[in-house]
């Protein structure tokens, strides 16, 4: 027996993504006749019997965010589809982003993590990652009517007195620390608070 962890999810997610890509001809009847072998698989343990528990930081729409207190978004839908394929119930645990991998590695909180997370060597030491399923760019945001523009941002943001709000533990934080060493990098627990700080005049950029 072993924990489900991300090791099993790696295979399941890859299979699920392949299934989604060719399932346009499936019928409701076929959906109700899932392979019993998935449901009968007892080679792993779960945090909660019969339930796939997903850890996330629900502040990153459209991948994961809260609507009326419920986690929704692309990652949530993807993980729920995996749970359905395994014949499991599904739950989401909302945690601060910089605690997700340590929480997964420690066990007892959640079985898998989906949180728009970039694969990095340091993170791979704590957990096994699936194949990349989405590629995107990151950008620094500033107030629209301010003096900083995309043409001068590289120089203007790298000055003493500039405060850049970042979400703690993200690759965005790493990028800002490496590229704006003269600015003050102020971590926040979630991206919502980071943007709120800028809008309140407590930060120059996010």
Please place each PLM-identified region on the residue numbering:
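Alpha-to-beta junction loops
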Residues: 88-89, 106-115, 162-163, 190, ...
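Sec-dependent bacterial lipoprotein signal peptides
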Residues: 1-20
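Bilobed "Venus flytrap"/periplasmic-binding protein-like clamshell domains
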Residues: 56-61, 71-84, 135, 139-195, ...
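Short helix-initiation/N-cap motifs at beta->coil->alpha
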Residues: 92-103, 186-200
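Extracytoplasmic small-molecule ligand-binding "clamshell" domains
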Residues: 39-116
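Short, solvent-exposed loop/turn elements at domain surfaces
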Residues: 61-66, 122-123, 175
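Bacterial lipoprotein signal-peptidase II cleavage site
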Residues: 18-34
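Acidic, polar ligand-binding/catalytic clefts
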Residues: 80, 89-155
């Amino acid at each position: 027996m072993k924990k489900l962890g991300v090791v099993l999810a790696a295979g399941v997610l890859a299979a699920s993504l392949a299934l989604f890509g060719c399932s346009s001809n499936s019928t409701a009847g076929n959906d109700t006749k899932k392979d019993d072998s998935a449901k009968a698989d007892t080679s792993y343990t779960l945090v909660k019997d019969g339930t796939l528990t997903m850890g996330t930081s629900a502040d990153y729409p459209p991948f994961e965010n809260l609507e009326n207190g419920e986690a929704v978004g692309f990652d949530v839908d993807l993980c729920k589809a995996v749970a359905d394929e395994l014949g499991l119930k599904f739950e989401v645990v909302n945690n601060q982003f910089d605690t997700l991998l340590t929480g997964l590695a420690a066990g007892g909180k959640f079985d898998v993590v989906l949180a728009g997370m970039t694969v990095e060597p340091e993170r791979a030491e704590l957990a096994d990652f699936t194949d990349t399923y989405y590629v995107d760019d990151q950008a620094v945001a500033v107030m629209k009517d301010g003096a900083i523009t995309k043409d001068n941002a590289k120089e203007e943001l790298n000055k003493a007195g500039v405060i850049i709000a970042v979400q703690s533990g993200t690759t965005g934080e790493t990028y800002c620390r490496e590229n704006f060493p003269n600015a003050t990098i102020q971590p926040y627990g979630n991206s919502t608070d980071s943007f709120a700080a800028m809008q309140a005049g407590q930060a120059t950029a996010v």
